[in-house]
C-alpha cells in the first residue's frame, strides 16, 4: 500500500486524525530516506577524494527481500543491496535461503576470480571443496567434482561460463542445492528444471567490484579492501 492510501486509511480510522504510531512510522521512513540520500553524497565525496577509511563510515542499502530465517531457524534474516537488486537472476527452484546466499557469494567470489570461461567451483558450507580450470566445460566440472565428491553432494556449483546441454546433463547426475552459470543454453535449462527443487541462478550480471568487504562483530565492523585478485595456473605450485 502506498503512503497516500495508508494516510487515507489512517484518517478514516481515526476520524480525520492520525495515531501516534502512524506518525512515528512516517517519521522513520522520512528520516531513513533523507539519511540514505545524505549517505550517497557522503560516499560520493569519499570516493572522489580517494579516502580509504574515513573517520565516519556511512552505509546505505536497500531491502531486497526478507528471508524465512537466518543461518539457524531461530534467527531472523533479510538481504540488502547497495543497488535495488542482487543482480542474481533465479530461473528455477525454491526461494533462496540465508545459507544459500552465503554459499552463492562464496562460490562466486572464487569462480569470478578464475580465468573467464574455464573455471568451475564447488562450495559446501561456504568453503570450496573443488576448483578447476579447463577449457572443456564438462571437463572443468568433472575435475572440480573429483577433488571431493563426498563433500560436493548437496553443495553449490558455480561456473564462470555459459552452461550448455552436455554440462547440464552431467550436472543432473549429482544432487546439488544450487547451480550458478554465466548464462545458459535453453536446452540446458530444460534439462536442469527436471530437478524440481534445484535452484538455477544466472550470474552473468555479477562482476567483481571494488567494494569493501564488511564483517560485523558485536558493536564493531571489520572492513577491508576486496579480495578480487585474478588467479592463473602459474600462481599455484604443487608442493607435495
Residue ranges with predicted function:
Residues 5, 9, 79-82:
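Short, compositionally biased low-complexity segments
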Residues 1-3:
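Short, small-residue-biased leader/transition segments that mark boundaries at the very start
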Amino acid at each position: 500500500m502506498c503512503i497516500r492510501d495508508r494516510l487515507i486509511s489512517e484518517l478514516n480510522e481515526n476520524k480525520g486524525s492520525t495515531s501516534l504510531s502512524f506518525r512515528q512510522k512516517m517519521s522513520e521512513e522520512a528520516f531513513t530516506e533523507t539519511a540514505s540520500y545524505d549517505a550517497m553524497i557522503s560516499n560520493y565525496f569519499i570516493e572522489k577524494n580517494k579516502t580509504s577509511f574515513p573517520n565516519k563510515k556511512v552505509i546505505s542499502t536497500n531491502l531486497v527481500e526478507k528471508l524465512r530465517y537466518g543461518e539457524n531457524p531461530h534467527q531472523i534474516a533479510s538481504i540488502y543491496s547497495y543497488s535495488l537488486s542482487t543482480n542474481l537472476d533465479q530461473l528455477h527452484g525454491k526461494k533462496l535461503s540465508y545459507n544459500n546466499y552465503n554459499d552463492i557469494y562464496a562460490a562466486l567470489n572464487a569462480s569470478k576470480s578464475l580465468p573467464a570461461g574455464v573455471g568451475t567451483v564447488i562450495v559446501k558450507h561456504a568453503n570450496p571443496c573443488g576448483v578447476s580450470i579447463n577449457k572443456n566445460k564438462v571437463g572443468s566440472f568433472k575435475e572440480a567434482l573429483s577433488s571431493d565428491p563426498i563433500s560436493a553432494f548437496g553443495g553449490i556449483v558455480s561456473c564462470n561460463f555459459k552452461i550448455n546441454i552436455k554440462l547440464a546433463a552431467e550436472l543432473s547426475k549429482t544432487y546439488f542445492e544450487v547451480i550458478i552459470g554465466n548464462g545458459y543454453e535453453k536446452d540446458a535449462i530444460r534439462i536442469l528444471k527436471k530437478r524440481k527443487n534445484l535452484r538455477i541462478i544466472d550470474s552473468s550480471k555479477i562482476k567483481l567490484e571494488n567494494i569493501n568487504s564488511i564483517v560485523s562483530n558485536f558493536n564493531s565492523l571489520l572492513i577491508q579492501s576486496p579480495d578480487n585478485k585474478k588467479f592463473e595456473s602459474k600462481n599455484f605450485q604443487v608442493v607435495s
